């Protein structure tokens, strides 16, 4: 049993830890709890995944022979069952269960400065969360809150639209499971609303403290906490070498309007950097992404600029792309004498990459 979750008569390898058992039974076994179709054994779960992937390979002609396909399936099953490697959660959630499974855990989206594009961003994120994955996006194309609209008035600005996206993320459980949606929201350091972005979470944290002191339930699912905004995303400011150098020299920095040059503003670069650090000290957000360095290390520069990352930031790539993660457990390749089994590791890598 884990909290309110309980499933009887489950089957796990003796070598698996209690923690691994809890996680798999609660999050990765598919089928309605207490129904005959509910998975109850690791053998069922691993066979569902490895068998489906092997069948895809057979259908698409990946294997030279029937025997090769069978060998691949057996090796992948062995690797997964002995915890030598593991796929990202959407694979366990969806493969062999959904007709068209969402397998990638990490998505990077894009958005343009139109209402249609902004609404499309929210729709895409909702579908990504439903499939058990997370997404990142850079909102710097959206005009600032002081910029004009064609038909009069001023724009809402990206920080305002973040409220709606944050609410959707808080509502949609990732993959229909207990895992919450994961978001990364990025804004460039030269965006006119960058200070609102820097402080949006810190201001909400002040509200959280006031509600706590007033006696509200501020646990993660409590009524008080769920009323606090911007809590379902990691926020990061995208900084360039030029900005950091200007801050170091104590120079001014230009905030650039997206569509209206009249809205440009000069600010003290060092003060802006200090405010970013102050907000991060208060609430651990925003983080910093070093735009210049990231793009200098870009492995596919011809495909476009890197503007954002996935929520955990290990995946940095072009907009409208996705990544299917897997992890290998290096300790499983350590021999009794402390040496590393390079041949077994290389073979496991080949099998897992083919499966991916």
What are these model-derived regions, one by one?
Residues 1-356:
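Extended catalytic cores of very large enzyme megasubunits
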